[in-house]
Amino acid sequence: DILAAFRVSPQPGVPPEEAGAAVAAESSTGTWTTVWTDGLTSLDRYKGRCYQIEPVPGEPDQYICYVAYPLDLFEEGSVTNMFTSIVGNVFGFKALRALRLEDLRIPVAYVKTFQGPPHGIQVERDKLNKYGRPLLGCTIKPKLGLSAKNYGRACYECLRGGLDFTKDDENVNSQPFMRWRDRFLFCAEAIYKSQAETGEIKGHYLNATAGTCEEMMKRAIFARELGVPIIMHDYLTGGFTANTSLAHYCRDNGLLLHIHRAMHAVIDRQKNHGIHFRVLAKALRMSGGDHIHSGTVVGKLEGERDITLGFVDLLRDDYIEKDRSRGIYFTQDWVSLPGVIPVASGGIHVWHMPALTEIFGDDSVLQFGGGTLGHPWGNAPGAVANRVALEACVQARNEGRDLAVEGNTIIREACKWSPELAAACEVWKEIKFEFAAMDTLDK
C-alpha cells in the first residue's frame, strides 16, 4: 500500500474518526451516496483505509490521520495519477477546516515503476569530473531584461571566475527582450570559452520550460545539439507529466536536468493546509530530476534546519528511517533509484559558506546569485570570492576543524590571501535574514 500522513483540522462538531474516514473515502472509492454500481466491484479491495489517528501536540482540534491506499488504485510510473487520486478532490471537503498532506510512504513495488532522476549524483560527478566538494552555481541577475548577448557575457564572467554552473532564473523562458534560441547560443559560447580558459567542465542551466510540451522538447533537443551538459525545468508550473517526459529525454540523450520548484510555497508554506515539500521532493525523485532547490536554512527563503535536512536525506539517500524529529513520518526504501542533488539558493553570500558546507555536505550545489553578481569589483571577482571561500571551508573541514564553530575565522584567514574574498566579506558583513519559520516541527 501507499501510506499517507494527513494533518486534519475538522470543522467544529466533526469527530476526528469521521474526518479521517472521509479523507480516506473521498481520495479513493467513496462518493456522497450509495450507488448501485458499488455491487459490481469489490470495494473492500480498492477503498482507502484510515488506520491510525493521533492528536497533534499543542494544537487543539488537529490530528495526524494515517491512510493506506491499495496499490491497484494507481497507474504505474505516473506521479500525475498518484496526486490526482490522493490530493485531487479531498482538499475542498466541507467537513474539514484545513487539510495538509505531510508525508507519503511509496512502496518498493511502486518505486520500481519509475525511472527517477535521469542520471543521479555519482554519474553527474563523473560527467563533470568534480569530486570532494559541493558544486558552485550562480543565478544570472537581473533575472529579466538583459539582452541575450549581455546575458551570455555575465555567464562567461562567472564561469571563468571559478563557478561550476550558471543558471537561468525560473521565469526566464522566451520573452521579447531575449528569445530562447539566442540565449541558448550565447550561453553555449560562454560555456565553451570558459572551459577552454579554465580547463574545467562548466555548465549553464538552460531553462527549457515552455507553454506546451512540444515547445519544451524542441528547446531540449536544441540544447542537446549545442552539446551543453545540463538543462532546466520548472516542475510544478510545468507539470509532472511534462517533467517526466523531459526526464526520460534527458536520460536517453545524456543531459543533466536541473529542477526549479517555482510555485512550491503556494502549496507547502502554510502549516495546516496544502502539501509539505517533503512530499513534493519525493514526487520529483520519482518523476525525474538531477538537482532540485531545497532551501538554504540560512538565506532569505523559508527552511527550518531539521525539516530541511529531513527532505535533503529523502532526496539523496537510498534508505531513510522514520524520524519524527526531522518530520519524516515513514521509513522510505528507494531501492537504488538514483539520488537528487539538493540546491541551496536564495539570499546567501560568502559569510554563509561555512554553514552551507557543514549543513549540506559535498553532494550539493551552493548557488549565489546576488552573492556573486553583487561583488563591488564585478562578476568574475564575485565568482573568485565564492570559489576561494568554498575551497577554504572544504580544506578546513578535511583538516578536522569545526565549521560551525570556526567558520568566520576560516573565512577571515582566507581573506588575507584573496582580495576578492576580502571585498565580498566587507560588502555583506551586515546582511541577515532573521525571521521566524512558518513551517516548524510539532513539539
From Swiss-Prot:
Mg(2+) binds at residues 167, 169-170. GO terms for cellular component: chloroplast. GO terms for biological process: photorespiration; reductive pentose-phosphate cycle. Its cofactor is Mg(2+). GO terms for molecular function: magnesium ion binding; monooxygenase activity; ribulose-bisphosphate carboxylase activity. InterPro entries: RuBisCO, RuBisCo_large_chain_AS, RuBisCO_lsu_C, RuBisCO_lsu_C_sf, RuBisCO_lsu_fd_N, RuBisCO_lsu_N_sf, RuBisCO_lsuI. It is an enzyme of class 4 (lyase). This is Ribulose bisphosphate carboxylase large chain. It comes from Callitriche heterophylla (Large water-starwort).
